[in-house]
Amino acid sequence: MTEQKRKIEKLTGVKGMNDILPQDAGLWEFFEATVKSLLRAYGYQNIRTPIVEHTQLFTRGIGEVTDIVEKEMYSFTDALNGENLTMRPENTAAVVRASIEHNMLYDGPKRLWYIGPMFRHERPQRGRYRQFHQVGVEALGFAGPDADAEIIMMCQRLWDDLGLTGIKLEINSLGLAEERAAHRVELIKYLEQFADVLDEDAKRRLYTNPLRVLDTKNPALQDIAQNAPKLIDFLGDESRAHFEGLQRLLLANNIPFKINPRLVRGLDYYNLTVFEWVTDKLGAQGTVAAGGRYDPLIEQLGGKPTAACGWAMGIERILELLKEEDLAPEQEGVDVYVVHQGDTAREQAFIAAERLRDTGLDVIFHCSADGAPASFKSQMKRADASGAAFAVIFGEEEVANGTVGVKALRGAGAEGEKNVQQTVPVESLTEFLINAMVASAEDGDD
């Protein structure tokens, strides 16, 4: 009796941690290239920090009573040395940690940017994932409202570069520590009047982080939050001057904004300016970028008192908008797909493919899928599906004559009567292809 073959279980990815497949990678590359060009134009330098940090970095930096620290962090104990570690839920704290550890501010302020995956343990939904990607900037050592205005305007310039519309700016000021303390006393008094109707989340926050109650999404609490004491009414002269200075700079540069007194952000390190860029095209997850000023953070993490501001934006949400507005660019194919028939032709074709790559052309060489030679027809199908501009064809007869076939697959040269296979001497192949691509591009511009 033959033993029945055991079925091997198919493994799948972790829910909320998504693969970026080849058909989507082009859109990611387009966004990354656009944002990197913008960041270079503003003089920002790239910094790359580890995915895993000591848990204390986030409990001290973000705040122990924030949702991120209380409910959303992927934390674990290192079995080797007992250290408490966390997969980064955001990257501002890590960038600040690195700037302190490596004494990066000894010679003055720094403009830094980062890009990479973040991790939060929450229920996956559209625009909200357990592994998600952010790009962000941190302007360390800049105290004035001009730095706040500059990082906000960077976002507007990025929306313009990407072609996105309908993303609106909301701003607020959280003032200084003593102003928040005075507001906190009055806010708790106000909220205590409604203790019987507050939901569990609001009750939990009432005495630990009452400011976050104003950010509630519960429809039943909207009137309570709307009529609560506003932090902006508690601002002193210094905070008010900073906020008004920001508004003047935004207005002078034609950046429309809305002052939202309930905008508080979910991280404890913010002071003075906070802002969000929001859209109504993504449902409940309408914030695509957010940030503000976090002057106390560098000192909280062991550095010298240093002013700082920055923002982070969710890449997945921006890509959703690009798709929604049909702004995703067409994926570009390679320049050449090399087809061959016969053993001798295969060897010559392989050598030619490498020589073409030496000149800077993008080339796919047809490799056998199953070890057996593929038919000419199937290879040409593969060539067309690859998106290549030209097929270069090596047959035994062509090789014997020192020639090669070239057929246009894309562009003006592939249309109508122009689309005929041409025979070209092998030694002239590179020059022929480059001239053909230039001619095709010029025809396409006409």
Swiss-Prot record:
Which CDD domains does the record associate with it?
HisRS-like_core, HisRS_anticodon
Q: What class of enzyme is it?
A: ligase
Q: Name one Pfam family in it.
A: HGTP_anticodon
Which domain of life does the UniProt lineage start with? Answer: Bacteria
Give the EC number(s) listed in the UniProt record.
Answer: 6.1.1.21
Q: Which GO terms describe its biological process?
A: histidyl-tRNA aminoacylation
Q: Which UniProt keywords apply?
A: Aminoacyl-tRNA synthetase, ATP-binding, Cytoplasm, Ligase, Nucleotide-binding, Protein biosynthesis
Question: Major place of localization?
Answer: cytoplasm
Q: Which InterPro entries match?
A: aa-tRNA-synth_II, aa-tRNA-synth_II/BPL/LPL, Anticodon-bd, Anticodon-bd_dom_sf, His-tRNA-ligase, HisRS-like_core, HisRS/HisZ, HisRS_anticodon
Catalytically driven reaction(s): tRNA(His) + L-histidine + ATP = L-histidyl-tRNA(His) + AMP + diphosphate + H(+)
The cellular component terms of Gene Ontology attached to this UniProt record, alphabetical and capped at eight, are: cytoplasm
Q: Name one GO molecular function term.
A: ATP binding
Q: Where in the cell is it found?
A: Cytoplasm
Assembly state and interactors?
A: Homodimer.
Q: Which PANTHER family match?
A: HISTIDINE--TRNA LIGASE, MITOCHONDRIAL-RELATED, HISTIDYL-TRNA SYNTHETASE
Q: Which family does it belong to?
A: Belongs to the class-II aminoacyl-tRNA synthetase family.
The name this protein goes by in its record? Histidine--tRNA ligase
